[in-house]
């Protein structure tokens, strides 16, 4: 159902109304790419066979190339993406490819995101030169910068955002938009803040009903980080990430039944955890 909906809006491009989005936009295309990757995992889990899963993977590969060809552009001097064909002003949604694992233009995109044209004390402007900011794109961006492996940069700006918006003068939740509604929109963006931690810092990616990949991004100043009582994949477990020396990490997973698994890996690498 989700894949069908994303495919529909991929071709029809739902109008955003508040800012121009063109006939096809970067955000919807990137979301559809990630949905195809997830559909491939799901097809395998449901026993649909390798042919179905491989079809989704091939479609994702083709779409990734087309995203680069169609949206890849130099905008305001940055090697990043045009949000839609003909767009020549930086938009916060250039972060979405990073969040979805598309990193061909990560260097220029990260530079643009944290440039004075987009970054403010409240996070990202929706469009360079405007006064509007949507927490949604800021939270996606921080998660995407972690996913791209720029841990120190992501942590620096996560701390800045958190200090201003969680500890400074603020409403006590992530907001839909500003200046629209004067920050009164309580929205699902609060959940996106949590996903910076689970999917950004810890790099959790579901690949099955009882399995996931883990790509931990432990900041250099931290010796360890942990998630306790993760209730997912049909289980209740703790995750502990510890530094084991230069470039080396150790992952300790402990289930609520006391079963423990230990994994050793190099920084930036990915492991698969199976809870079956």
List the predicted regions and their residue ranges.
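Active-site core of glycosidic bond-cleaving carbohydrate-active enzymes
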Residues: 1-4, 8, 23-54, 58-61, ...
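A short, charged helix-loop
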Residues: 9-18
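Short, well-ordered surface patches within globular domains
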Residues: 65
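A broad structural signal for short, well-ordered beta-strand segments within beta-sheet-rich domains
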Residues: 19, 79-82, 222, 248
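Beta-rich accessory regions
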Residues: 49, 55, 62, 70, ...
């Amino acid at each position: 159902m989700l894949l069908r909906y994303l495919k529909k809006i991929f071709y029809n491009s739902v109008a955003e109304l508040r800012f121009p989005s063109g006939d096809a936009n970067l955000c919807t295309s990137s979301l559809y790419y990630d949905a195809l990757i997830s559909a491939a995992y799901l097809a395998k889990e449901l026993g649909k066979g390798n042919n179905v899963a491989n079809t989704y993977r091939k479609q994702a590969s083709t779409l990734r190339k087309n995203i680069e060809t169609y949206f890849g552009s130099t905008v305001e001097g940055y090697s990043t993406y045009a949000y839609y064909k003909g767009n020549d002003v930086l938009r916060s949604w250039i972060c979405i490819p990073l969040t979805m694992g598309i990193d061909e233009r990560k260097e220029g995109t990260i530079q643009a995101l944290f440039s004075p044209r987009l970054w403010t004390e409240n996070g990202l402007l929706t469009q360079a030169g405007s006064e509007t900011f949507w927490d949604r794109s800021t939270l996606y961006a921080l998660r995407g910068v972690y996913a791209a492996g720029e841990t120190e940069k992501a942590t620096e700006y996560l701390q800045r955002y958190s200090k201003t918006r969680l500890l400074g003068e603020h409403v006590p939740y992530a907001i839909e938009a500003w200046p629209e509604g004067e920050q009164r929109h309580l929205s699902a963006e609060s959940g996106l803040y949590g996903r910076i931690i689970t999917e950004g810092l810890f790099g959790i990616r579901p690949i099955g009903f009882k399995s996931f990949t883990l790509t931990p991004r432990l900041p250099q100043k931290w010796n360890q980080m942990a998630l306790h009582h993760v209730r997912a994949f049909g289980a209740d477990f703790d995750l502990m990430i510890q530094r084991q020396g230069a470039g080396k990490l150790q992952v300790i997973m402990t289930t609520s039944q006391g079963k423990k698994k230990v994994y050793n890996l190099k920084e930036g690498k990915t492991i698969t955890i199976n809870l079956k």
